[in-house]
Amino acid sequence: MAQNIYDDPAFFEAYSRLPRSKGGLDAAPEWPSLRALLPALNGLRVLDLGCGYGWFCRWALASGAAEVTGVDLSARMLDRARDMTPEPEITYVRADLESFAPGAASVDLVYSSLALHYVEDVQGLFRRVAGWLTPGAGLVFSVEHPIYTAPRAPEWAIVNGREVWSLDRYLQEGARTTNWLADGVVKQHRTIGTYVRLLRDAGFTLLAIDGWGPNATQIQHNPDWARERDRPMFLLVAARRNA
C-alpha cells in the first residue's frame, strides 16, 4: 500500500492551508495548461485518481460529465470532499491506486493531478488504466516534474551569486524521501523518458507533454513565481488509449 501521509493530522492541517486547498482549481497555477489538455466532457464517465477535496470532480460534472468517480487513499480527504459535494452524480471511493479496479471499459476519461508520483508501481497502474478505458479514450495527468523530484536535496542554492536549482541523481529512479509539510514524505522519481515508455508499453499514444512554467501574465500577478521559469515544477501529460 502507498504511504497515506494525507491522513496524518499535522500534514493534513498544513495541506489545508495551501492556496490550492482553499481556492481549488483556480488557485492551482498549472490548471489552465492542464485544462487545455482535456477533451470535451459532455456525457463522459470520468474517473479522478487521487481526487483530494474533489475540486476536479465537481468541475467535471459542471462541464457536462455524465458521472464522476473520485478515488483517494485518504479518509480525511474524502470526508472533506463529501462535505463539499452535494451532487449525487459524483461518487467517492476510498482505495489504494495500486489495487483499485473499477472494471473493464467502464470509463471514458481518467484524470489525475499530482498523485501518480506517490505510486510505486505506476507501470502496473498505466496498464490497468488502459483496461478501464474504452478504446480511444483519454488519460490526462500531472506529476511533479522529474527535474523537481530528482535531487537528494530539492532546494535552490546560490552559485556565483545566482540562484540555481541543484540537480543530481536524475537517472537514479526510485523513492525519494522529502520533508514537505511533514517529515518523511515518500515520492517516486522517474525520468521523463520512463513516463513516455511506460505509457507506450501500456497501450497509449502520447498526445501532449508539457514541462509547466508560469507565463508572463501569471508572473506579473504573482512575482514569487518568477523562479519557476528556471526550473519546471510540474509535468503535464495527455495520452489516448489505442483502439
Predicted regions mapped to residue ranges:
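A short acidic, Gly/Pro-enriched loop at the edge of an enzyme's catalytic core
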Residues: P102-L109
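Class I SAM-dependent methyltransferase SAM/SAH-binding core
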Residues: L47-L49, Y53-F100
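A short glycine-rich, Lys/Arg-flanked "PGG" loop and its adjoining helix->strand segment in the class I
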Residues: Q123-G138
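Short alpha-helix
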Residues: A175, V186-I209
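C-terminal lobe and adjacent flexible extensions of AdoMet/dcAdoMet transferase-like proteins
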Residues: L198-A243
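Conserved class I S-adenosyl-L-methionine
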Residues: M1-L41, W55, W59, R80, L139-G174
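Acceptor-substrate binding/catalytic loop of class I
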Residues: V143, I147-T149, W180-G193
